[in-house]
Amino acid sequence: MTRPISFVTGNAKKLEEVRAILGPKFPRELLPVKLDLPELQGEIDDICRKKCLEAARRVKGPVLVEDTCLCFNALKGLPGPYIKWFLEKLEPEGLHKLLDGWEDKSAEAVCTFAYAPGEDAEVILFQGRTQGDIVYPRGCRDFGWDPIFQPKGYDKSYAELPKEKKNEISHRFRALNKLRDYFVAENQ
């Protein structure tokens, strides 16, 4: 029997969303594991690789970590991988206000999943990107910066969209599609 993958998260909403997107036919079992990993600085791919290797070392087995960025084009990619800290300090209104002096309200949501089959194994990255705009906070406020991100082609923020719709278009959906394809192919 294949060993379950430890999915490093302490966020129940994220776990729920990941399981909903992967669906019941995903060929591996995901077990949530809460680890206090170091908050690294740098570029998203490097951050994800390092976090994944540290998690694999601690778990001593297959591990999956996720990192999300929200990149404001007017701010040359900031807050980027530091979105968690910006959101914690500024809340959605403050994030929106960061762009007050800028005409360009466009942004890119980036989700990167990093998988390592074990300690000292090569890390595989699965990345999804969604273009959109930063809007005044609208909708439910129970999931991070969803109230301020409006994906291109939609007139609603992530928070205003039905979960099923968001889970068909989001940056996380795009990354998880790649991850699912990898594991389905590996299972054949």
Swiss-Prot record:
One of its GO terms (molecular function) is XTP diphosphatase activity. It is an enzyme of class 3 (hydrolase). ITP binds at residues 9-14, 51, 67-68, 84, 143-146, 166, 171-172. Its cofactor is Mg(2+); Mn(2+). Mg(2+) binds at residue 39. Its main location: cytoplasm. PANTHER family: INOSINE TRIPHOSPHATE PYROPHOSPHATASE (PTHR11067:SF9), INOSINE TRIPHOSPHATE PYROPHOSPHATASE/HAM1 PROTEIN (PTHR11067). Homodimer. This is Inosine triphosphate pyrophosphatase.
